[in-house]
């Protein structure tokens, strides 16, 4: 599959069915998916082949506590520096998963499948990810 867009030679953007995108662009080796219950319900048949970390829904999960939960799950799954972390979801999922992946073991490779319009123009191509602390963004 060829990218539909190339953002600053750093991010490739693919458009199409999730199964086609994943089969055409994921790196060789181990992939762990970070997502939420809505995406899991809608795409379980596509994502079932990967180890998955599910987070809650909404802005309230964009916290260090969620990042710590992701770290614990990564440890349970044996995620190491050769693992590719794929965040599938909207901006909250990509922000939290991107932050967790970039800080776990001093950073593991990660990518996004952004499922919302806002996530597609903000969190997935902004080059930075983060969580809220004590209600501050």
Put a short name on every predicted segment.
Residues 83-88, 137:
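Short, basic, helix/turn surface patches
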């Amino acid at each position: 599959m060829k990218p539909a867009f190339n953002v600053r030679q750093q991010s490739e953007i693919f458009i199409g069915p999730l199964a086609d995108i994943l089969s055409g662009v994921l790196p060789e080796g181990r992939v762990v998916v970070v997502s939420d219950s809505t995406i899991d319900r809608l795409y379980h048949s596509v994502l079932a082949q990967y180890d998955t970390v599910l987070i809650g829904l909404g802005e309230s999960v964009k916290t260090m506590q969620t990042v710590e939960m992701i770290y614990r799950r990564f440890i349970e799954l044996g995620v190491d520096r050769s693992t590719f972390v794929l965040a599938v979801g909207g901006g909250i999922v990509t922000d939290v998963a991107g932050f967790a992946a970039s800080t776990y073991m001093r950073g593991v490779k990660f990518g996004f499948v952004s499922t919302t319009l806002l996530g597609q123009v903000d969190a997935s191509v902004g080059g930075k990810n983060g969580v809220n602390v004590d209600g501050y963004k």
